[in-house]
Amino acid sequence: MSEQERIQDCLRKEIRSLLISTKDGLTPQQLEKEYLLMVGNHLPLRILGYRSTMELVLDMPDVVSVCPGGDGTVILKAIPDESTKGIASLVAKQRRSHKVRNSMPKGRPSICSGRVPYRGRVPPILPAVVKSELKDLLALSPVLLSDFEKAFARRFGRSFQYMQYGFLSMFEVLNAASDVISVEQTRAGSLLTLKKSVSEDKQRGWPAGKVFTQPFRMKQQGSYSTGFPVMKAHFSQPISNMEPPKQVLSMAKTPTFNSVEASRLNHTEKLNQLESTFKSVIAQIGPGGTVDPELKRKIQFVVSKFPQGLFISKLLGEFELTFKEQLSPKQLGFLNVTELVGALSDILRVEFSEERQDLLVFDADLKPLPSGGPLSSVRNSCLVQPDKKTEANPWTSSLSRNSLSTVAVKKTTWDCPLKNQKEPEQKIYKKPNLVVKPLQLQVETNKPQLSLSVANHDIPPDAVRAKKLCRLPPLDTSTLVGVFVEYIISPSQFYIRIYSRDSSELLEDMMIEMRRCYSNQLVSDRYIMPEYFIQPGHLCCVKISEDKWWYRVIIHRILGKKEVEVFYPDFGNIGTVQKSSLRFLKCCYTKLPAQAIPCSLAWVRPAEEHWTARAILHFQKLCGLKPLVGVVDEYIDGILNIFLCDTSSNEDVYFHHVLRTEGHAIVCRENAPSKGFRDFNPPALYTNASSAGDMVLTDLGHPAQQHYLNEDQEILQQAQQDINDGKCISYLKSAPKELLKDSKLSSLKTHKSCEEDPRWSILQPKDLKEENEDEVPTGMPCLESVTIGDDVWDENWLPLQAKMGKAGSPASQLFTSNLVGKKQYQTGGEMAQKDWCFSTSKDIWDDSWQPLGLANDVKGGIHTPEGPIAQEKNTSTTRIQQQPDLQYPLDSSTLPKLEEFYISLIKSQQSAERSQSEPASIQTHAGRAASKALSSTPAVGDSPENHSGSVESSPGSLKKEDVSNSRAEATAKDKSQGAIDQLSFILSPQHQISQKLYIPRSTATAVLGAAARLATSRSLLHWYPSVKGGKLEAERDGVK
């Protein structure tokens, strides 16, 4: 039983015992007091997740019975169980005390009692300041009730303490604010929104289609009933939608010119009385009725000091200067000063100035400026519209005799179309007549669309207006990433999206959040883009009706009145959408950089002048909808040149090889600028470069991989220093590139031809058999195939760093330690069936392992290794310094570098006996033994004294590793020929067994599998030739 269940079970017993001991029950307040006296602590409401005592007892129907009291209170009585029935019966038989009985009133209670019975606690009134804050919060967007506390704290910097206002729960607060807040039930929960004006109009009971607000001038003439004068008034409907609505009081019969003067006067008095009634009733029920009359007079006094009008933005400042006190609209319950002025339309009049593009406030008692003055009509989002005369009719002519020559009709609206129309205004006398189309200020106060901008459209404060997305930071050369090809124009012009935790997964999370946000109809309507914001280069979002998702888009060009062409910065494609589907993008959705990266396939150019349709179609089929392995080559004019490889099949597919084999492309060793992106590059036009410290793809920098890359740089720097200091072991000097134009290392001829090996043709790709050496550039990047066993790929494996030379000195290059699928030298013992793990122990360079020193034996300058291969337990990296002979200079770019190789570890599954003395048996069983092997040859530094011909003499040798012993013995047995054979078999990819490579989806993109060993244009992979034949062309073709 959990702690919470134990507390609840104990609480049920305590409450039952308290209520059983009371014959007449307890109220919730009495229960709290009794519990505090008995236990010494308050009821554990918060611990159990309850907000009030009533919620607690209602959740215990088997313990507490809620009964209504005679005076309207709630009485809680206990429901006894089997063990407490006897106690309950005894308590029920108890007599009431004499004192209590005497205090009870005798006889029937008096009907005319002067005491009002208690009907329960009356909920307090929500203060105007709190109501204003709630309106301010919900004006931005609706808020779920579960998120209300967080939203309020984020908006105002404090929590919403409703208890200090006298409320017991949030439910009472919402009831008190029901005039401005409505609660809607959605799937996500209760949604709090601002109430619409239409609902208020219906609640007031006005006729359909008519909206009544305060008139411009109201005189207090006593209190009037809100019933009969209002309901007797009938108004005619507007004649036309184009004309301003004119309200004319319709009467059963119009008085004729020959009517009696007394009758006419009586009728006029009735009309005046009706007019006053209208003004009084509307003023009393509107928001302006809550403003203190003394404050109204002060505001009117300030405005009256400016006959030419006071700008609404200066009203608060002038009020403070005049009366030395601040005027806060929020403390009065208004959202802003505009809402306050709108509520005081009985004493203030508002006009819009075309010259200053601002609102002017006038005293309603003052006459306006004559027509043609600096003031003109108020357009959309303003408070009033120009005056218009009503048509002459018998009723207005009769009213003109009663000191009114003209009926000034003030038409005001919030929903008028955008027009720069200027119409003459009519003079408003001190006592205006009926309002033809009433001012809709009180109706609109609850709408968040109040705006004083001249643009006359409500723009959400968090909407993106003139902001651009950032691009992803450039990737380092030789970085290995997982990519999706999103949009293809040609092999020289396509877009990729990096697959990682901090790129693709963040994009998915953002799209899910955008769908949740914009799917709300209220939010979607609020973020509609007006016509004048739809301009090329504007960042916004759009929903695709086919898949119901929202995407970030950038407007590229406007196609017509209804359609625009947009660019998708996260996917790279361009599409056509409707203008009506565009929405403002919230600022929080601009933090994620644009995910689409413009790319060009490295080292290829079209066979003809342009890419053919068949070449593009074939490239699209290669990419498909699957993750690919990509290695960064370089950036040219901001375009990423990248190699692509598909590792999902049994054999790795290199896209540049396939395009060249099909005759669609020519492989070259240089990257040419993309012509397509040079003509049109949307990311360069519409996005900004990422900042220096903005590293988004942190998934490429997992602690393991980032540590690995950092140590790579340190090792390379230290290795370069060792080269300069002469500490390294016989480095090769770089040869000029002219010596490598033929790309044939004819000097390194071997004794046996690889073509004679029957397994050579089997393992060699068919499409690469007939390729000529001249057609394949030197050092083409390749991805080594790896046999996958039954072990589980460990995502936390990380490459280790190489050490060479003396203890603690770094190795400049790391040997390819993946021996999977290659021929192995083994003894007659079985391969160890155990898991190997990476070790961070420092490995010392063994001078006896020098593969290119062995190669010198071919040319006669034999350089014999000085001892066996030393090994260390629980290490998985082989430290090798590859050094060609100085007699055969090579290009330094063909030497493998540290970051070209990734190390994999595969368990051995099958046992095979190998003969130590017969190399032929080694070759025979090599294919079978290559399926499962150790992924690396651990190297341990030996002192010069320990260099002997047997592996047992090595202090770092393994005790129970037959594979390592056999390899060491074979190397020590035949240092010249056997070591060369071993090296050639290790480095020869023709003797691999290509099996399917599985890439776990959750694995970091920098570790995309055991076969993730690619060379790049700056770090070319160079396979050293074997001694199996005199021709190297077939071997190099197999590598390619």
Curated annotation (Swiss-Prot):
Listed Basic and acidic residues bias regions: 958-975
Main subcellular location: cytoplasm
Tudor domain segment(s): 533-592
Keyword Protein biosynthesis: no
Domain HTH OST-type span(s) in chain numbering: 7-80, 122-197, 291-365
Phosphoserine sites (modified residues): 809, 943
Entries under PROSITE patterns matching the protein: HTH_OST, TUDOR
Tissue specificity statement from the Swiss-Prot or TrEMBL entry: Gonad-specific. Mainly expressed in testis. Present at low level in ovary (at protein level).
Keywords, in A-Z order: Cytoplasm, Developmental protein, Differentiation, Phosphoprotein, Repeat, Spermatogenesis
Key word Phosphoprotein present: yes
Domain of life where this protein originates: Eukaryota
Matches recorded under InterPro entries: LOTUS-like, OST-HTH/LOTUS_dom, SNase_OB-fold_sf, TDRD5_LOTUS_2, Tudor, Tudor_domain_containing
CDD domains for this protein: LOTUS_1_TDRD5, LOTUS_2_TDRD5, LOTUS_3_TDRD5, Tudor_TDRD5
Listed Polar residues bias regions: 872-891, 912-924, 946-956
Function: Required during spermiogenesis to participate in the repression transposable elements and prevent their mobilization, which is essential for the germline integrity. Probably acts via the piRNA metabolic process, which mediates the repression of transposable elements during meiosis by forming complexes composed of piRNAs and Piwi proteins and govern the methylation and subsequent repression of transposons. Required for chromatoid body (CB) assembly.
UniProt similarity note: Belongs to the TDRD5 family.
Protein name listed in UniProt: Tudor domain-containing protein 5
Biological classification of the source: Eukaryota, Metazoa, Chordata, Craniata, Vertebrata
Gene: Tdrd5
